[in-house]
Amino acid sequence: MDGKEASLSAQERPVSDFPDMLKKFAAAVEANDGAGLAALFTADGVYEDGFYGACTGAAAIAGMVAHFHETGESFRWEFFDPVSDGRAGYAHYRFSYRSKVAGAEGKPVAFEGIGHFALRDGKIARYCEVFDRGVALAQQGFAADRIKRVVEKAAARQNATPEFAAHLRRLAERSA
């Protein structure tokens, strides 16, 4: 550890094993290992899924992984170009699976996104992601009105967050 890193608190130090954390994260989801994924999170950790919303704590995170495998199979998750400063991490990803949803059984679903990891003491305090939900839903052959409902729900959830509400207020002030 160099002098600069030694002067940083443990929370501020770069996570040198962030790529390894991503490998464990992906492997746990692929293997339906909810406990393994939850172990990467802090006790109060939050996994904010792009479809299912926020899951807080080990039991909820493990349950979400089980739900993934109820609605899909043959998961593949690959992370690329990871960067982290010890407090935050980002990685580009490719995610794919075969749908088990009624009416879309066996259809391959693949999309790209960006994962954001808020880190604390070498664990994930919060994970959220950005991807095009419409791309994922369209590959399952869902009707346009169903896709629209899902995307509108995601937009409402996004716009209701305190951060985004403040952003939209600034937009309204600028437009006035």
Feature locations, PLM:
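Short acidic-aromatic low-complexity motifs
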Residues: A10-P14, P19-L40
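A beta-strand edge to alpha-helix "cap/lid" segment located at domain peripheries
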Residues: D2-R13, A66-A176
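Hydrophobic pocket/interface hotspot
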Residues: F25, L37-A38, G45, G57, ...
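Hydrophobic alpha-helical core bundles mediating ligand binding, dimerization, or RNAP-core interactions
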Residues: L22-F25, V29, F41, V65, ...
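A solvent-exposed, acidic/Ser-Thr-rich amphipathic alpha-helical stretch
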Residues: G34-R87
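A short, mixed-charge helix-start or loop-turn motif at secondary-structure junctions
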Residues: S7, F18, Y47-G50
